[in-house]
Amino acid sequence: MILQNKTFDLNPNDIAGLELVCQTLRNRILEVVSANGGHLSSSLGAVELIVGMHALFDCQKNPFIFDTSHQAYAHKLLTGRFESFSTLRQFKGLSGFTKPSESAYDYFIAGHSSTSVSIGVGVAKAFCLKQALGMPIALLGDGSISAGIFYEALNELGDRKYPMIMILNDNEMSISTPIGALSKALSQLMKGPFYQSFRSKVKKILSTLPESVNYLASRFEESFKLITPGVFFEELGINYIGPINGHDLSAIIETLKLAKELKEPVLIHAQTLKGKGYKIAEGRYEKWHGVGPFDLDTGLSKKSKSAILSPTEAYSNTLLELAKKDEKIVGVTAAMPSGTGLDKLIDAYPLRFFDVAIAEQHALTSSSAMAKEGFKPFVSIYSTFLQRAYDSIVHDACISSLPIKLAIDRAGIVGEDGETHQGLLDVSYLRSIPNMVIFAPRDNETLKNAVRFANEHDSSPCAFRYPRGSFALKEGVFEPSGFVLGQSELLKKEGEILLIGYGNGVGRAHLVQLALKEKNIECALLDLRFLKPLDPNLSAIVAPYQKLYVFSDNYKLGGVASAILEFLSEQNILKPVKSFEIIDEFIMHGNTALVEKSLGLDTESLTDAILKDLGQER
């Protein structure tokens, strides 16, 4: 196989050669991720599995489907991207996830968890209809099996018996480690040809026996299966092989050969170590899952920690403060306790905070039930993952107007994770739902007040959003004030045009305001605060101004400017309104500042756009 300037011979019979390939791949992953940041530990842990897959299968005839795909770095290196891997997660460089537009070897876009088996079932159905050779091969992590879509796909797969290989990469994040010699012996038995042949023959024999005898024989087989791993999968009609050592290339190759011959759905349970090959990261799951640039020798971050709290920290600190005084506060997250800041609250009040795993729909529905019972559930969730729970928001929270509180983290452009993780949709779909209150803070201090308002709001569901990393508005520029339902805040009154900011858009609008002032153009500045309900006095507030310019980190369609235009139209008020929201396309990965500049959302571009609209030149 040609890797641009590298040539590797992936001979499945040359285990020593494959091990050298694995070491080369690990070295390259460490070299690049230490410089760029990325998903390190999962990618290091999956190297042997991916090398084994490529050694035995042509991935263009047997599509490789990577669940979430943050573990697919070795796959990228083995498919012509060894040299360009240095651009990983950089603006206009390689994506940190599989991306068909980047390479024909990347079968499917990925970034969210638990979709691989469902995709594989779809591929298998299509292959059967086309009478195509080959079968899909899905590599998924053990965390992925907590989501409902995984079981929905297994249900059909076990019933239809489509040929498909699933490799369950168990790095001890969710699945218990088998214990003792019996488990090891049964594993060797189950992955061997004797066991598979035995199972096949027993099934054939049982099918020929009279019903009375068949019942006793079936009970014998059930007893045999109960002492083996993987009973659950076998009961669904999925062949189970394992556990195997996911770093033992001999075991991987032999197991994949067996799975290939079965021509049925097979799940291979492979145990791996996250961070394999980098001692500092081995076994330290949370710290080394997603990392920024770091020193390869010491493991220390190359970026010094900011003295200013991140929005996530400001949120979680405030929630902890409130939780100490209010026993009705409960916290819910979907497999992201650290990312959403709930880890410290779980430590303080473990009985009142719930990590429901990768189950966003369940998070929202169960939270709605807790709200009905008088509790105050704060559902802490990334914007990109909230969209997976849309029906639960509508059906279970909003129809009954149950006062759940949606704390929407990573709202707006998120940077290096790209299309699958941008937090740009929540504004548009949430504002369309009756009974939903939607608001946004402009900085850390108003975020703290937003949490306090949400805690007291008890008449309906509410949602507030905040960005990744930091707000655009520096702390202390404007005095913080509390939230009052449906009230905006006019931060600067003087001017002929009005800049309207929503959430993080206030900071962007303020920077433009300062730039225009240097051009002797005075602008008023409004912090919209509430998107739903809008300030009932909005028509009076905007009346003195000739033009309105709207700034917000969300899609333009169905966004903040749309809401303002709808409101003014109902009041029979005609005002020129220009939106500086996100254009109607999926936004690529890269440094946030570079991405914003490419979209014309940096201060210089925004200032020029307003000057042009006003008929002036810079």
From Swiss-Prot:
Keyword terms of this UniProt record: Isoprene biosynthesis, Magnesium, Metal-binding, Thiamine biosynthesis, Thiamine pyrophosphate, Transferase
Disulfide bond annotation, renumbered to this chain: none
Binding site for Mg(2+): 142, 171
GO terms, biological process: 1-deoxy-D-xylulose 5-phosphate biosynthetic process; isopentenyl diphosphate biosynthetic process, methylerythritol 4-phosphate pathway; terpenoid biosynthetic process; thiamine biosynthetic process
GO molecular function: 1-deoxy-D-xylulose-5-phosphate synthase activity; magnesium ion binding; thiamine pyrophosphate binding
Domain of life assignment: Bacteria
GO cellular component, one term: cytosol
Cofactors required: Mg(2+); thiamine diphosphate
Function as written in the Swiss-Prot or TrEMBL entry: Catalyzes the acyloin condensation reaction between C atoms 2 and 3 of pyruvate and glyceraldehyde 3-phosphate to yield 1-deoxy-D-xylulose-5-phosphate (DXP).
Listed PANTHER family: 1-D-DEOXYXYLULOSE 5-PHOSPHATE SYNTHASE-RELATED, 1-DEOXY-D-XYLULOSE-5-PHOSPHATE SYNTHASE, CHLOROPLASTIC
Oligomeric and partner information: Homodimer.
Listed name of the protein: 1-deoxy-D-xylulose-5-phosphate synthase
Organism in which the protein naturally occurs: Helicobacter pylori (strain ATCC 700392 / 26695)
Phylogenetic lineage: Bacteria, Pseudomonadati, Campylobacterota, Epsilonproteobacteria, Campylobacterales
